[in-house]
């Protein structure tokens, strides 16, 4: 009898064997019913379903509620809707959770997950803090801000500066409004008229204007209108016409100085680094997109509002400095730039970028300058 040789089983590649085993396991479980099948596939559920619930952030802005209705609320509402329940950002206005002066510390400690502010106002411990907010004559138009960040190295400088700070991530900087001085009873028609005026103002521009006797005063944002009414403040040097009308300060102030020492406020978004790390990539991208949307909203709101209210606004009388006084302010700003540039090599890089940008815009001519 001839022996019949049994075929020798082929050895499976370990990887292929693993795949087949997985398939057998799946088919076995599938036969147990729909409920068991659903239970066996939860490992492939979307990212958010693996969490205990939606990611929740607390974001505080430098602005009060009337202004916040334009400079950030539309963005946060849009983000929360688009996040589809995966993430919710709770929005707080100036001083609601922490005092504005404590914004940075609260962000760094994780009390806040994100902040919208400028460096100078929230006292960021970086050597470029002076450039946040209003830096005298750094800009003429709102588009100058994103152009400086994209083409003149400011983005890299900001990233470098915040890389040195634990637990804080800089996300983006955009433009706000130009800076004007609004007063209650004392019109400014010369530099001498600034002497002794107590104004609610931003740090860097306030420091520069104190050269002419202006006295910057810091109080909670919500107290400004009452302080103007009681005489605690003589005016504000904190914003442009659009904000002055929107938040009610134009109802209290009677005079507006049309000269502007800078064309746009530098405002930024920051995140607590551990909080940012917990956000999945698609929600990070969504948040950054919503920031860009907010930058665009503000650019249009301010650009249209400033011109319209200067021409059609009837709540304040416009005043202007004499040409000789204004020329002195412009000339004094050059020394102020050099003073700030000398504070650190990084600050020097920012001022060098401002000078290069200003030179380029002047050479380009109309409509740039």
Model-derived features with residue positions:
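Short, solvent-exposed helix-to-loop capping segments enriched in aromatics
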Residues: 156-157
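N-terminal secretory/targeting leader peptides
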Residues: 19-21, 25-41, 46-145, 160-164, ...
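N-terminal secretory signal peptides
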Residues: 1-25
């Amino acid at each position: 009898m001839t022996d019949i040789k049994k075929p020798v089983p082929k050895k499976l590649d370990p990887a292929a064997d693993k795949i087949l085993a997985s398939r057998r396991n799946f088919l076995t479980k599938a036969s147990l019913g729909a409920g068991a099948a659903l239970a066996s596939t939860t490992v492939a559920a979307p990212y958010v379903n693996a969490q205990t619930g939606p990611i929740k952030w607390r974001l505080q802005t430098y602005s009060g509620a009337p202004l916040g209705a334009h400079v950030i609320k539309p963005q946060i509402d849009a983000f929360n809707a688009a996040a589809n329940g995966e993430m919710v950002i709770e929005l707080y206005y100036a001083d609601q959770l922490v005092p504005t002066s404590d914004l940075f510390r609260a962000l760094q400690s994780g009390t806040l997950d994100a902040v919208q502010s400028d460096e100078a106002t929230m006292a960021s411990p970086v050597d470029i803090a002076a450039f946040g907010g209003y830096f005298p004559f750094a800009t003429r138009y709102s588009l100058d801000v994103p152009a400086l960040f994209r083409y003149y190295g400011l983005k890299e400088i900001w990233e470098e500066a915040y890389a040195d700070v634990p637990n804080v991530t800089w996300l983006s900087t955009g433009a706000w409004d130009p800076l004007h001085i609004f007063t209650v009873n004392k019109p400014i028609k010369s530099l001498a008229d600034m002497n002794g005026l107590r104004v609610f103002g931003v740090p860097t521009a306030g420091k520069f204007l104190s050269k002419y006797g202006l006295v910057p005063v810091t109080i909670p944002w919500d107290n400004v209108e009452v302080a103007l009414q009681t005489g605690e403040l003589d005016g504000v040097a904190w914003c442009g016409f659009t904000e002055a009308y929107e938040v009610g300060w134009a109802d209290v102030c009677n005079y507006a100085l049309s000269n502007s020492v800078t064309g746009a406020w530098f405002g930024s978004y920051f995140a607590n680094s551990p909080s940012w790390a917990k956000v999945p990539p698609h929600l990070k991208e969504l948040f950054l997109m919503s920031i860009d949307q907010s930058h665009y909203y503000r650019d249009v709101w301010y650009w249209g509002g400033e011109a319209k209210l200067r021409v059609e606004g009837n709540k304040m009388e416009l005043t202007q400095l004499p040409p000789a006084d204004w020329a002195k302010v412009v000339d004094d700003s050059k020394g102020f730039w050099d003073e700030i540039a000398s504070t650190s090599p990084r600050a020097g890089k920012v001022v060098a970028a401002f000078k290069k940008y200003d030179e380029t815009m002047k050479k380009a001519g109309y409509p740039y300058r």
